[in-house]
Curated annotation (Swiss-Prot):
Xref: PANTHER family: OUTER MEMBRANE PROTEIN, OMPA-RELATED (PTHR30128), PHOTOSYSTEM I P700 CHLOROPHYLL A APOPROTEIN A1-RELATED (PTHR30128:SF19)
Entry's Gene Ontology BP terms: photosynthesis
Positions of transmembrane segments: 47-70, 136-159, 176-200, 274-292, 331-354, 370-396, 418-440, 518-536, 576-597, 644-666, 708-728
Amino acids binding chlorophyll a B3: M663, Y671
Function comment: PsaA and PsaB bind P700, the primary electron donor of photosystem I (PSI), as well as the electron acceptors A0, A1 and FX. PSI is a plastocyanin/cytochrome c6-ferredoxin oxidoreductase, converting photonic excitation into a charge separation, which transfers an electron from the donor P700 chlorophyll pair to the spectroscopically characterized acceptors A0, A1, FX, FA and FB in turn. Oxidized P700 is reduced on the lumenal side of the thylakoid membrane by plastocyanin or cytochrome c6.
Keywords: 4Fe-4S, Chlorophyll, Chloroplast, Chromophore, Electron transport, Iron, Iron-sulfur, Magnesium, Membrane, Metal-binding, Oxidoreductase, Photosynthesis, Photosystem I, Plastid, Thylakoid, Transmembrane, Transmembrane helix, Transport
UniProt-recorded name of the protein: Photosystem I P700 chlorophyll a apoprotein A2
GO molecular function: 4 iron, 4 sulfur cluster binding; chlorophyll binding; electron transfer activity; magnesium ion binding; oxidoreductase activity
HAMAP family, A to Z: PSI_PsaB
Length: 735
């Protein structure tokens, strides 16, 4: 009986006599399209079933957070005093801890060593109405059941009787309706319901749970105003500025408001504003989900909409003709669009979590603020790089030139030189000018003439801030001018709390900006445009270029076309992705440095340090990186250790992983192949060791594989190093 060797999905690889079988097997495990015997229908079914597994993992993970906080955390103590108790994520059980470590990590009122939570879950659960450990346990158990249900659903949809057919997967209108109405619309409506029935009453000291849920009116007039059209009643009598969150003191009765600004005590958005926001989104999306033609012969057809989109001027050729089938038949195109959207949204989450904090007391937990910002920006970067990667794979595997003749997609390819060269020009302009300004300022400081620095006020950005109501700059226009119509309307009609919030120095709305911000803004613009240049060029040149017209025949990732064809190395679409990730990490480094340093000054009440030191490179290196590393690297020293020691160690460990990346990035395949052959020679001639044999002949990783291993270590090390720096430097200052 012959045992089937890994990988089962590729007979060719399973029969490979070398260790390539293992590494290529792992590398192509998720490339379902290219597996043996894969049909289009089976491909869709496999991916569909895997979505249930994904949801199960997410629910299980969230369930674990709830469970560990309920079991080992201090949620009930934190609720009593959110600003003075440090939230505990979970206990640490480590038999290696000496007494100093046990004492250093015993905090937050715990009886033994614990980890402090910097994820914001305490603030989130508190805001949505949870108050006891029992609430957390119930949530945890519910999510465990939900995860189980999703796992079962995933299994079920792989059974022949319950596998949807290909036509079901390609029914674009039904899917649009379902996702718009069902997922976005109804879930937003359900969330509005939770906020109105549970969270808002809890914020006013009224405890609503399943036992009194149906007997407690969320508004004194019940549904009467809704049915009589007197909707304004729901906005009357909002919570006052003196409201104590979680109590009835200073509370009102409004459930759907348009107050704007922040709750003065919690520094977070008004719950009644958020309920109103989700209700509006629910209405919009439920309506949107009834717009597409399915069973009843009414509504829009996506195909008809796209076929009709031809610019009357003729300047866009065939417009959107042919795009319906191109998108609907390409999973890579769809994934590219989805990743581009989600990546952008993820970056917006990073921006809004600190500028418009939705959770009570989040704004006063500085380490959590910094962590959430950094976390969401890095994730956005990876997701957006993935969008272009799948865009490139679409061009190689799925694009049909005949079906897209003269449409906007074909026209993008036809004028790709103009697109790529413009991005190149912008990147060069930004790079030389920004670096030139920074370096000039360094030289002036170094030569003892700091007054000769070139310091440019960002007047256009300040003008935009002023038009939204920021008065600090003295630009009298629109909302920053008390005699303007916009200002008058803003007082009564919409968001009366906005102008107070935007001119309050205790939050992060429309921060005051100067020459340092102007420079770092352009440094970040350089990073964004260079990353985009590499990604866009990779996708637009994926099918071929003047240098290599037959590139698409070589697939998504290839190292070179042999020794006989010079210049074909490093030009696969995969290589563009690989290079772009380095630029992405570089850019997000600048973004997070900027956010963190500027906020450290605001939180410490010392904004002048950023303003004075951020205009030259040595200022960034000395007053941000070096100065904020000092406490971190003293987590352990000759005199002992403290609670930052774990971050000190992780800082070193991150550097180690990062440096390991270069080992794979700098020394290439031939070096490893020679080394491996030497090691095999030695192994076979060493007593005892020579008893151990293997079937696969050891060979080095391919060039592309070595690059991906190098990239993975570079990325992981880079992020772990900064995570340790960020958490240690922030928590050391603010506890």
């Amino acid at each position: 009986m012959a045992t089937t060797k890994f990988p089962k999905f590729s007979q060719g690889l399973a029969n490979d006599p070398t260790t390539r079988r293992i590494w290529f097997g792992i590398a192509t495990a998720h490339d379902f399209e290219n597996h043996d015997g894969m049909t289009e229908e089976n491909l869709y079914q496999k991916i569909f079933a895997s979505h249930f597994g994904q949801l199960a993992i997410i629910f299980l993970w969230t369930s674990g957070n709830l469970f560990h906080v309920a079991w080992q955390g201090n949620f009930e103590q934190w609720v009593q005093s959110p600003l003075n108790v440090r939230p505990i994520a979970h206990a640490i059980w480590d038999p290696h801890f000496g007494q100093p470590a046990v004492e250093a990590f015993t905090r937050g009122g715990a009886s033994g060593p614990v980890n402090i939570s910097t994820s914001g879950v305490y603030q989130w659960w508190y805001t949505i109405g949870m108050r006891t450990n029992q609430d957390l346990y119930i949530g945890s158990i519910f999510l465990s059941f939900a995860a189980t249900a999703f796992l079962f659903a995933g299994w079920l949809h792989l059974q022949p009787k319950f596998q949807p057919g290909l036509s079901w997967f390609k029914n674009a209108e039904s899917r649009l309706n379902h996702h718009l109405s069902g997922l976005f619309g109804v879930s937003s409506l359900a969330w509005t319901g939770h906020l109105i029935h549970v969270a808002i009453p809890e914020a006013r000291g009224q405890h609503v749970r399943w036992d009194n849920f149906l007997t407690t009116l969320p508004h004194p007039q019940g549904l009467t105003p809704f049915f009589t059209g007197n909707w304004a009643a729901y906005a009357e009598n909002p919570d006052t500025a003196s409201h104590l969150f979680g109590t009835s003191e200073g509370s009102g009765t409004a459930i759907l408001t348009f107050l704007g600004g922040f709750h003065p005590q919690t520094q977070s958005l008004w719950l009644s504003d958020m309920a109103h926001h989700h209700l509006a989104i629910a209405v919009l999306f439920i309506v949107a989900g009834h717009m597409y033609r399915t069973n009843f012969g009414i509504g829009h057809s996506m195909r008809e909409i796209l076929e009709a989109h031809k610019a009357p001027s003729g300047n866009l050729g065939n417009g959107h003709t042919g795009l319906f089938d191109t998108v609907n038949n390409s999973l890579h195109f769809q994934l590219g669009l989805a990743l581009a959207s989600v990546g952008t949204i993820c970056s917006l989450v990073a921006q809004h979590m600190y500028s418009l904090p939705p959770y009570a007391f989040l704004a006063q937990d500085f380490t959590t603020q910094a962590s959430l910002y950094t976390h969401h920006q890095y994730i956005a970067g990876f997701i957006l790089c993935g969008a272009f990667a799948h865009g490139a794979i679409f061009f190689i595997r799925d694009y049909d030139p005949e079906a897209n003749k003269g449409n906007v997609l074909a026209r993008m390819l036809e004028h790709k030189e103009a697109i790529i060269s413009h991005l190149s020009w912008v990147s060069l302009f930004l790079g030389f000018h920004t670096l030139g300004l920074y370096v000039h300022n360094d030289v002036m400081q170094a030569f003892g003439t700091p007054e000769k620095q070139i310091l440019i006020e960002p007047v256009f950005a300040q003008w935009i801030q002023a038009s939204h109501g920021k008065t600090a700059y003295g630009f009298d226009l629109l909302l920053s001018q008390s005699t303007s119509n916009a200002y008058a309307a803003g007082q009564s009609l919409w968001l009366p709390g906005w102008l107070e919030a935007i001119n309050n120095n205790n939050n992060s709305l429309f921060l005051t900006i100067g020459p340092g911000d102007f420079l770092v803004h352009h440094a970040i613009a350089l990073g964004l445009h260079t990353t985009t240049l590499i990604l866009v060029k990779g996708a637009l040149d994926a099918r071929g270029s003047k240098l290599m017209p037959d590139k698409k025949d070589f697939g998504y990732s290839f190292p070179c076309d042999g020794p006989g064809r010079g210049g074909t190395c490093d030009i696969s679409a995969w290589d563009a992705f690989y290079l772009a990730v380095f630029w992405m990490l570089n850019t997000i480094g600048w973004v997070t440095f900027y956010f963190h340093w500027k906020h450290l000054g605001i939180w410490q009440g010392n904004v002048s340090q950023f303003n004075e030191s951020s205009t030259y490179l040595m200022g960034w290196l000395r007053d941000y990186l070096w100065l904020n590393s000092s406490q971190l690297i003293n987590g352990y020293n000759p005199f002992g250790m403290n609670s930052l020691s774990v971050w000190s160690w992780m800082f070193l460990f991150g550097h180690l992983i990062y440096a390991t990346g270069f080992m794979f990035l700098i020394s290439w395949r031939g070096y490893w192949q020679e080394l491996i052959e030497t090691l095999v020679w030695a192994h076979e001639r060493t007593p005892i060791a020579d008893l151990i044999r293997w079937k696969d002949k050891p060979v080095a990783l391919s060039i592309v594989q070595a690059r991906v291993v190098g990239l993975a270590h570079f990325s992981a090390g880079y992020i772990l190093t900064y995570a340790a720096f960020l958490i240690a430097s922030t928590s050391a200052k603010f506890g």
